[in-house]
Amino acid sequence: VRTQESGFDMRESYVIGIDIGGTNFRIGAVDDGGKLLHHHTDRSFKISHRENSVDLLVQYISDYLIQEHFQFPRAVSIGFPSAISRDRQTLYSTPNLEGFDGLPIVSILRKRLGVPVFIDKDVNHLLLYEIVARGIGREKSVVGIFVGSGIGNSIRLGGSFWRGKHGAAGELGHFQLPGRKALCNCGNVGCVERYAAGRRLEEIARVNFPQTEIDELFLRYGEQPILEEFVRDLSIPVVAEINIFDPDYVILGGGVLSMKGFPLEQFLEDIRSHTRKPYPGEDVEILLSDADPRNGILGAAYSALEGLKTGVCIKEERRMSI
């Protein structure tokens, strides 16, 4: 899918935002005012390979910049579905994509691309987009939970993302469900995203409803016990996070929640009925993301613009020569 949002002057200043999920890879150019100039969507497997994922990623970015005439970005900002070091330089673990674990990805990409490079968890970019788009104040506490191939979690406190000691905070998808033994891609067993995220739905469709497209599972079989259990399991980590943080806002999103027939009202009722009373349960404010696939690109771009403004990234004057 290629979309030209508007005509633009090639002399204007822009950054490249990239959103890499377990399923889809999205890239786009965003000007300094936050306007999306162009975007392109592809499948993530095209940059995922055990031996040469970095080469594939660099080549993909370079090809996009040449083909769409964006050879001179101020920066490139990428959201990975990964656990990332606190200094946002290294990918610790990327369970749903091969070839990215343990890489000092920022230094590699900066050298290969020749421009400042920023990275963060993909869900941090999604939440940043929501905060900017909704005009939520810096003083507010906001948690975001986005359910796609896995379960992404972002925590924003006092205007900054909560990263934890090592940068691994917010791994809500690896919250353990008692008594569950299925092996997760992370190497542990019983992780909630193994039971209540997109990859589990793929398994349910394949094993239980082989004649049904995955996007029609809830529409056709939402009252089946296996899917009712899926929804209940998904509410458990959401309730836990609300009870722990007592946030001003909870933002829920991702492809699973926007599936046709997903029982959203029941899901929200499960959450509200199990949060601690009287607070945070009585007045927790739950907002739903609009699930626009461009949000991750824009959030990545906002992160780059913020980083360039505050000097988070070491500035490099050398422009990309490709």
PLM regions and their residue ranges:
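ATP-binding/phosphotransfer module of carbohydrate and carboxylate kinases, centering on a glycine-rich
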Residues: R2, G7-A75, I84-D87, S107-V115, ...
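Conserved A3 ("GATE") glycine/threonine-rich loop of ANL adenylate-forming enzymes
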Residues: T23-N24, H125, G148-G152
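Hydrophobic "anchor" residues
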Residues: K35-L36, T90-L91, F161-W162
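Residue-level detector of high-confidence beta-strand sites
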Residues: H39-T41, T94, L128, G164
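A charged helix-plus-loop insertion that forms the helical arch/lid used to bind
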Residues: Q89-G102
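ATP-dependent carbohydrate kinase catalytic cores
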Residues: V115-E130, G137, V143-I145
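Glycine-rich phosphate-binding loop of actin/hexokinase-like ATP-binding domains
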Residues: E139-Y195
